[in-house]
Amino acid sequence: MAFPEPKPRAPELPRKQLKTLDCGQGAVRAVRFNVDGNYCLTCGSDKTLKLWNPLRGTLLRTYSGHGYEVLDAAGSFDNSHLCSGGGDKTVVLWDVATGQVVRKFRGHAGKVNTVQFNEEATVILSGSIDSSVRCWDCRSRKPEPVQTLDEARDGISSVKVSDHEILAGSVDGRVRRYDLRMGQVTSDYVGSPITCTCFSRDGQCTLISSLDSTLRLLDKDTGELLGEYVGHKNQKYKLDCCLSERDTHVVSCSEDGKVFFWDLVEGSLALALPVGSNVVQSLAYHPADPCLLTAMGGSIQYWREETYEAEGGAG
C-alpha cells in the first residue's frame, strides 16, 4: 500500500505585527512596496513622498516637490526612479538616489489618483478624477502625453499594467482593459463605483473592489465572475485590494479598521486582521513573501507570518 502524499504546506498569512512606523507626513494616503519588496514608499497629505526600509524602520529619503497631497506612487523595475501623482494634478518622475525631480508632467484637469510604470519604466500611466488615463514618455522632452485613454465616464480610481495590457477602474462602475497589441478595449460592468483593480499574479484573472463592500474575481479574457468576497466595509473611500504572493488569498482594506483575507477558491473568510480603530487607508503585499504593509492615519504597520524570525534581530 502507498502512503498518502504529504499535503503541501498551507500558505501562511501575515498576522504578526513587527513594526509600526510614524511617518511624520500627515495622513498616509498610500503605501507601496518597491519591486523586490525590500523598501517601501509612503505618500503623505503633507505633499511629501518618503522611502523607507520597513523592517528596520529607517527613513532613507524624503522627496519634496508636489504642490498638494501625494495620492499614489510607484517604483521602477531597476529601483532607479519613482513616479508619483497627487492633488496638484501633476505626475512627477523622481531620481531615487538624488531625490531630485527629473520631470513634471502636467495635463490632467483634476487630481491624480493612481500612477504606474510600464514594465520597462519608459512610460508612466496616470489615472485622474478627470476621467482619463494618460501615458507619459519618460524619455521625451515633449510636454503632452503620448496617449490619452478617455473612454471612462467618471473618475479613474485605479490603473494597473501587465505586459501589453492596461487595467483601468472607474467610478462609472466599469473596469476597462486595453490590449495595446491588438488596439482593443474590453469593458466589464460592475455597477458600483470601482475603488481598486489588480491582475492576479498568474495574469489569468482580475480582482475588482467597489463601493458596495464587495470584491469580485473575474476571468480576464471572458469577464466571467469567478468569485465574490464580502464581510469587509467599503462604502465611502478609495481602498486597496490585492492578491497574496501565491494567489491563494484575496486581501482588502476595510473602513472598520481591519484587513480581510479570503480563501480565493472557497470564498470563505480566512482572517480579519485588526489594525486599529480607523479606516485602513492603504495596503501593499510583498511580491514573494507573506508580508503586508498597512496604512492607518499617519503611520504604517509591518506584518509577517507567525513563524517569521528576523535575521540579526532586526524585528
Curated annotation (Swiss-Prot):
Location of the protein in the cell: Cytoplasm; Lysosome; Nucleus
Broad class of the protein's primary localization: cytoplasm
Function: Molecular scaffold protein for various multimeric protein complexes. Acts as a module in the assembly of a multicomponent scaffold for the ERK pathway, linking ERK responses to specific agonists. At low concentrations it enhances ERK activation, whereas high concentrations lead to the inhibition of ERK activation. Also involved in response to hypoxia by acting as a negative regulator of HIF1A/HIF-1-alpha via its interaction with EGLN3/PHD3. May promote degradation of HIF1A. May act by recruiting signaling complexes to a specific upstream activator. May also be involved in pre-mRNA splicing.
UniProt repeat feature WD, residue ranges: 23-62, 65-104, 107-146, 151-188, 190-228, 231-272, 275-313
Annotated Pfam families: WD40
Gene: Wdr83
GO biological process, one term: response to wounding
Tissue expression summary: Highly expressed in testis and brain. Expressed at intermediate level in heart, liver and kidney. Weakly expressed in spleen and lung and absent in muscle.
Name of the featured protein: WD repeat domain-containing protein 83
GO cellular component entries: catalytic step 2 spliceosome; cytoplasm; lysosome; nucleus; spliceosomal complex
